Amino acid sequence: MSKSTLVNVKNLSVRFPVYGGVLSRKVAEVRAVDDISFSIGRSEIVGLVGESGCGKTTVGRAMINILKYVAPDVEVGGNIIYHFDGETVDFAELHPRQVRKYRSRVQMIFQDPYASLNPRMTVQQTVEEPLKIHTELDKGKRKEKVIALLEKVGLRSDQAGRFPHEFSGGQRQRVGIARALATNPDLIICDEPVSALDVSIQAQVINLMMAVSYTHLRAHETEADLVCRLLLE
């Protein structure tokens, strides 16, 4: 293993149980991911490419240990080993609550920008939330950080008080990107971040992602070829 390796995924498998019958017993299982292994180095951009339904989203969610929130009975096998400043942590062995302390180190940008944003929270509140949880910045410093992040992703400071429904799809995804960048994570996992956007907006978002040098991009669009230095199929 290279000293610059950030995460090693070893023999990852994910199975979702299928229940049936009067007593709702397990009658089968769906193999969403079957024995996949790869590694990602620091400052490396990696793309996981495949057709719809092949398990890309499941791999991403497994890597940040949120599958239990989606499906409590899911079975996850293998190892997801992160190397944080000399500390080695296997996310596959941790309860989701135990992962919270590392959540600032690994962030995710979701496919549907509208569904991933709380409609009752302003952009200011959305981007500020991870700063409240994972940093000790006071209110003034947090506000300054939020404004800087919005400007970094191409939004204006006077848009901070608006709600998600007041933005276009591309702008909402920019908010999601700003939120993911807030804690300066070691790894950002992108779940097909442009697939729900118009083609013209896709180019803008991809250019933005290239500008901020993401550690990890995961998509099945061919545009990923333009961004990733390594493609896994």
Regions found by a protein language model. Name each.
Residues 23-26, 83-107, 133, 139:
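ABC ATPase NBD coupling module
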Residues 49-50:
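The feature captures the beta-strand-to-loop junction immediately N-terminal to the Walker
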Residues 79, 83-86, 140-158, 211:
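Conserved ABC ATPase "signature" region
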Residues 163-167, 171:
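Conserved ABC ATPase signature
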Residues 177, 189, 205, 226:
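Hydrophobic anchor residue at the start of the ABC signature
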Residues 182-186, 202:
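A short, proline-enriched helix->beta-strand linker immediately N-terminal to the Walker B motif
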